[in-house]
Amino acid sequence: MAKIDEQDILKRIQDPQSRRRAFEEIVNVYSRQLYWKIHYMMQNHDDTDDVLQNTFIKAWKGLENFKGDSAIFTWLYRIAYNESLTFLKQRKQMTSIDDEDFVEQASFVADEYFDGDNTQELLMQAVSTLPAKQRQVFCMKYFEDKKYEEISDLVGTSVGALKASYHIAVEKITNFIKSKE
């Protein structure tokens, strides 16, 4: 991933003449990383693309108000996280399915980027059964090895709540895998 000079980007964002080009750089640098963060929650390429597009639209609309109190990626991730949750809530309301049906429909579908063995596939199936927020916490902690404090900053939840959520997710995943063996 290419690096950007955040101070330079902040200056250019404030100038209407250079705002569009600065935003294009932000999109180019962070879109792939955001895609995979969103994909952890969506578990579907098309939905991930929709949420990613909504994330950048919302970021563009709020760009001139971004003051740099957090890193650009943290700001974008927070938007993406909220957009993901909104999307999942709307999808659940539109389809009006109960939780058991949702779990069945959310089963992991291997895509072209996934070529793991049976254990990895079982893990991904188990992860896909978790509620969206819990799945995101688990993925950031387990797959990305993020510290609880960093996850807390990204999702706006206390460290204690994150630890509890992660612990419950691990229990659910363990039980899921044991039931399939």
Regions found by a protein language model. Give the residues of each.
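Internal acidic/polar
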Residues: 2-7, 86, 93-120
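Short, charged helix-capping/linker segments at alpha-helix termini
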Residues: 14-25, 35-54, 159, 180-181
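Structural recognition of an alpha-helix C-terminal capping motif at a helix-to-coil junction
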Residues: 50-57, 70-82
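Arg/Lys-rich amphipathic alpha helix in sigma70-family domain 2
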Residues: 65-67, 81-97, 168
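DNA-recognition helix of helix-turn-helix
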Residues: 85, 134, 153-180
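A short pre-motif secondary-structure segment
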Residues: 137-141
